[in-house]
Amino acid sequence: MSPITLDLTSDFNPANTTGAGSSSSQPRTLLVAPPSVASHEERISALFSTYPRDTTDLHMLDRLAAGLVTLPTSTYDLILVLTDPDGSRHAEASALLSNRAVWSLLVPALKAGGKLRSEDGTLGRDTTTPEAREAVLAGLVAGADGFTKPDYAEEEAVPLRFGLKRKTNPNPVVAPIQPVAQVVTAAPAGVGFVTLDLNDDLDLDGEDDDDDVIDEDTLLTEADLRRPIQQPPECQPKPGKKRRACKDCTCGLAERLEAEDKARRDKADQALNTLKLKSEDLLELDLTVPGKTGSCGSCALGDAFRCAGCPYLGLPPFKVGEEVSILNNVPQL
């Protein structure tokens, strides 16, 4: 049985990213590969023969998905997903790229204007795949050869100067004003005044013709006049209540109720007038004349003929010529 050797070194080697042979002007490349690529050393050796080791980094997709790797920000010009040129590992890479945590690490590490593509060239062609949707949601733009990170210009604060503190010249030089000859043009006849005839439209002379006014009654036929008036449901009185007209009554109920109230008031006034007594209808009590009685017909005849509420109840009959006055409902003889 052959011995098993474990490689415990980190995949991210800082010496490779900041080596003596690297330069900030040289484009940097990040290779991301599915886990199955790690078992093929010849495959990795062939990749580093194409991409220089001093400007290229290699990471595994499963370690990116697990959050075990930290990538520098805005460093790589190209991120290449290894799937083999024949696409034999495309399904494995697509499954890992469907994880949003992978894109949250790859997109910040990509420079503005940098590209992210797959080795077989199929990544980004179909924008309906799960990995394409995650790339677009992360901020990349799909293209024919993969995805591109937009180059957004950095925000800059620009001060606004409104010219409030402008320096003024204490002795400004004023250019002489050249006199301009005034050109006088004669107005043509009929121009320059307006004559208004207000009598044509406003009819201020008081003569108003009703030629354009249509009488509404002429629009009704005999059948319309004989037709009974349809009472609206809202005008119908509720049980136990008096029928009342609406505020904007148009069915004639308000006029009819007003006429009924007026007739009722006239009848009540007529009945009230019949109960009023005139001066000649009043009977004056004159005790100086023998045989005269009060309005009740028995006040001067004695106690037996006085009313129940008479203040002189219990007193003897009045004498002829006797003056009688009442003060506070008390007889004063």
Swiss-Prot record:
Species of provenance: Neurospora crassa (strain ATCC 24698 / 74-OR23-1A / CBS 708.71 / DSM 1257 / FGSC 987)
Organism lineage string: Eukaryota, Fungi, Dikarya, Ascomycota, Pezizomycotina
Residue ranges of the region described as N-terminal SAM-like domain: 23-158
Protein name: Fe-S cluster assembly protein dre2
Region (Fe-S binding site A): 235-251
Residues reported to bind [4Fe-4S] cluster: 296, 299, 307, 310
UniProt GO cellular component terms: cytoplasm; mitochondrial intermembrane space
GO MF, one annotated term: metal ion binding
Quaternary structure, from the entry: Monomer. Interacts with tah18. Interacts with mia40.
Keyword Nucleotide-binding found: no
